[in-house]
Curated annotation (Swiss-Prot):
Similarity annotation: To E.coli YbeT.
Protein name (database record): Sel1-repeat-containing protein YbeQ
SMART domains noted in UniProt: SEL1
Keyword Cytoplasm: no
One biological process term in Gene Ontology: response to oxidative stress
PANTHER family according to UniProt: ERAD-ASSOCIATED E3 UBIQUITIN-PROTEIN LIGASE COMPONENT HRD3, SEL-1-LIKE PROTEIN
Lineage top rank: taxon: Bacteria
Pfam family, one: Sel1
Keywords: Repeat
Keyword Membrane annotated: no
Sel1-like repeats: 26-61, 63-97, 103-130, 132-167, 168-203, 205-239, 242-275, 280-305
Length: 325
């Protein structure tokens, strides 16, 4: 393998290791990077990566400091150390490393001892450098009032900066603000536009939302086939709400042929995830014999689960079923 990087142009890995052993920090970083590629956590190569990255980082190598800081955040690693992660990420961030600034913000935001105010500082630095991930993260902080006063207008501003760069989560978050009219005038058409952008990149929440929009005709022309298409996309990623709505569409023949068995299977899939709406729909099917024999005992058990969940009042359905038993 041949590397091309400054002092190590056109050198083999053995030649770079030789330079690294003599104290060349660029060579040390490259060796650390080499061992870090796809290495299993706590494997021999992972230990070598730590060793060489730390040597380079201690000499002030910015990329090594960033990489080392990131490695200290790895879950399940025996080296995981929040304080060391912050220490090395801050070293790199202070040298102007934008990715380190965002990673430092994330570690301060989501780490063992959250410090939202400091996280905002580092997100801001990275966001102002144009980094879409940091812009989305900063938007989230303003939206939720973490480390700053809640400000939907600023959340909207930063989400839009990231969304325009194609950041899928930001596109979804921007759509949420248009949907709810927070930080911007409510606009269902623009909400649907951004949900679709995000959904096309695989965002599960956006896939569910654009399916809902097509189903209800909100911000787009009603289109049951498109609704089913996107519900299935969301369901493939584990969206329980999509399971329920697919079941409903099969039950009522929306975008597909009416199919009680398919409806029952999708409702059951959601019910297994403890979804009360799915319990209710299954109870109805058992109660009235929709696609299966009437089973009042099963219907009653499901109605009682719904009632216990507090999500809807089904006391009348319970009484009616009890009267039939």
């Amino acid at each position: 393998m041949i590397f091309t990087s400054s002092c190590c142009d056109n050198l083999s890995i053995d030649e770079i290791i030789e330079r690294a052993e003599k104290g060349d920090c660029e060579a040390q970083y490259i060796v650390g990077f080499y061992y870090n590629r796809d290495s299993a956590i706590d494997s021999p190569d992972d230990e070598k990566a730590f060793y060489w990255l730390k040597l380079a980082a201690e000499q002030g190598h910015c990329e090594a400091q960033y990489s080392l800081g990131q490695k200290y955040t790895e879950d399940k690693s025996r080296h995981k150390d929040n304080e060391q992660a912050i220490f090395w990420l801050k070293k790199a961030a202070l040298q102007g490393h934008t990715f380190a600034s965002n990673a430092l913000g994330w570690t301060l935001d989501r780490g063992e001892a959250p410090n939202y105010k400091e996280a905002v500082v580092w997100y801001q630095i990275a966001a102002e450098s144009g980094m879409s991930y940091a812009q989305n993260n900063l938007g989230w902080m303003y939206r939720n009032g973490n480390g700053v006063a809640k400000d939907y207008a600023l959340a909207f501003f930063w989400y839009k900066q990231a969304a325009l760069q194609g950041h899928s989560d930001a596109q979804n978050n921007l759509a949420d603000l248009y949907e709810d009219g927070k930080g911007v005038a409510q606009n269902k058409t623009l909400a649907a536009f951004w949900y679709l952008k995000s959904a096309q990149q695989g965002n599960r929440h956006a896939q569910f939302q654009i399916a809902w929009d097509y189903n209800a005709g909100e911000g787009v022309d009603q289109d049951y086939k498109q609704a089913m298409y996107w519900y299935l996309k969301a369901a493939a990623q584990g969206s329980v709400g999509a399971y329920v709505n697919i079941g409903y569409m099969y039950k009522h023949g929306q975008g597909v042929e009416k199919d009680y068995q398919a409806a029952f299977e999708w409702f059951t899939k959601a019910a297994e995830c403890n979804d009360a709406t799915a319990w209710y729909n299954l109870a109805i099917m058992y109660h009235y014999g929709e696609g299966r024999p009437v089973d009042l005992r099963q219907a009653l058990d499901l109605y009682r689960k719904v009632q216990s969940s507090g999500t809807r009042d089904v006391s009348q359905e319970i009484r009616e079923t009890e009267d039939l038993l």
